[in-house]
Amino acid sequence: MTTPFDIALIGERINPGFKSTKALFDNQDIAGIQALAVKQAQAGASWLNVNIGARALTDTPWMATVIAAIQDAVSVPLSFDFPSKKVQAACLAAYDPAKAGGALPIVNSITEHRWDLMELYGQYRFKVILMASERVEDVGGVQVAKGNKTADEIYGTARRAALRLMNEHGMPADDIFIDMSVSAIVADTEGLNRATIDAIALIGADPALKGVHMMGGLSNIGQQLPPKAADGSDLKHTLECAFLTLTVPLGFDTVLGTPWRGYEPLPPDHYVLKAYQHFLEQSGTQALRAVRKLYRA
């Protein structure tokens, strides 16, 4: 399946967070994992995200087996979803670029506070997902991670870290994916969705960041909301499309998601798009009321 949006898809399904995938891992069902990889590739995924859960920390051979099996089944490159330098090193060692047409894998992910993963860049070449949701601050001589809540904080972190990757490590802009955290709107009284969209606009307009990608997972945005919008549409899916309708023109170009969801731009008069835009203008209890308008006309 292709998407009318000009975006790339990173297939998210090889992850034990999905019950059906957890069963494949629990049963060591290699053929089932391969079939899931093929399904995502055939649905248009440009990369496949791989996360085998906590077992990655204790069973490197099993992880290498999974990576090899996936690469035997598909030719799309892989994204390794682990915060551990040790695990990432094992993933990169197991990955065979030749089976992906020479394409580099993605390390998912680094932050300013977790920069040690870049020590692997001398031994291996890879693309990287850079989390813009947290920054590092010096507090009494100690480096402390702080969450970003404003557009300027998100943009400042993204710019600082992306330029560091390019200038200190020689990483091409095209190999950098800035992860823009897309939060659930159900309890977003602080304008976090609005801050994310405003930050996307700032990053997309910065000539120093030309060529850098912006991405995110969209599954959180509709969490804990009813299945249907007030107009009868699939609320969660339509919300995801509303977010993309607003952000793809600003430079958001990659989605970590389920490839067969079929993201489509919404027309300007679409009920959910208009209700989401209204929500973005609100804060506090007014934002909560605006969320209810999505499913109560």
What do these predicted regions represent?
Residues E119-E281, Q286-A290:
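Catalytic alpha/beta core domains of metabolic enzymes, predominantly
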Residues T2, A41-Q42, Q71-D72, L92-A100, ...:
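Acidic (Asp/Glu)-rich catalytic clusters
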Residues P4-A35, D59, N108-S109, V139-E153, ...:
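Active-site mouth loops of central-metabolism enzymes
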Residues N49-R55, V76-S84, G102-H113, A132, ...:
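Catalytic beta/alpha-barrel core
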Residues A41-V76, Q88, V182-N193:
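Glycine-rich, proline-tolerant flexible connector loops at the mouths of alpha/beta enzymes
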Residues T58-G102, T196-M214:
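Alpha-helix-loop-beta-strand connector modules within alpha/beta enzyme cores
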Residues M1-A23, A31-A35, A43, D253-A297:
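Extended, intrinsically disordered, low-complexity segments
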Residues P4-L9, S46-N49, A69, S75-S79, ...:
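Structural preference for beta-strand elements that scaffold enzyme active sites
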